[in-house]
């Protein structure tokens, strides 16, 4: 799974170019933006892993977002931009992300970023601050996609987008 769902095109093409030379190997795309190669031998799997060494290293880096308002015509906010800002902020601060949960971010109330099923999810919104509209996201807390404990999270608040990276830092 590429970090944030954004694959490095050169790495992806190298992996696909290698995979087409193999017998019975298939590539499959999962709904959470993951790409799986199936029917590999152990040596072939190691080679694919080597070619895609930019893959996410922990659950937090496997966070997902929809494309957001920069591409989607109905998206209210830039969900993918928010995810990149969060990654950059926490990396800059030296925060160990191995214990943070996977985020699910949608640019609007629709569920393209599956915000309802994340332990922490966000969906695009607007918040009035001093009577001025600000880019914001609704925090959705407590969702689960794990078998046996599936449930939608509850809306917990509306946070100005620029404050979300700091919120996750604490």
List the predicted regions and their residue ranges:
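Accessory RNA-recognition modules of RNA-modification enzymes
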Residues: 1-5, 38, 138, 154-157
């Amino acid at each position: 799974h590429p970090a944030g769902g954004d694959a490095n095109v050169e790495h992806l093409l190298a992996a696909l170019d290698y995979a087409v030379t193999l017998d019975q190997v298939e590539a499959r795309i999962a709904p959470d933006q993951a790409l799986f190669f199936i029917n590999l031998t152990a040596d072939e799997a190691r080679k694919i892993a080597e070619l895609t060494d930019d893959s996410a290293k922990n659950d937090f880096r496997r966070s997902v977002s929809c494309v957001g308002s920069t591409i989607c015509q109905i998206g209210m906010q830039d969900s993918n931009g928010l995810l990149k800002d969060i990654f950059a902020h926490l990396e800059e601060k030296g925060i160990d992300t191995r214990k943070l949960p996977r985020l699910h971010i949608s640019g609007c109330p629709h569920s393209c970023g599956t915000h309802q099923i994340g332990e922490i999810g966000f969906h695009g919104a607007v918040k009035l601050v001093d009577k001025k509209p600000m880019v914001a996201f609704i925090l959705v807390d407590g969702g689960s996609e794990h078998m046996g404990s599936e449930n939608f999270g509850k809306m917990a608040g509306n946070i100005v987008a620029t404050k979300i990276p700091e919120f996750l830092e604490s």
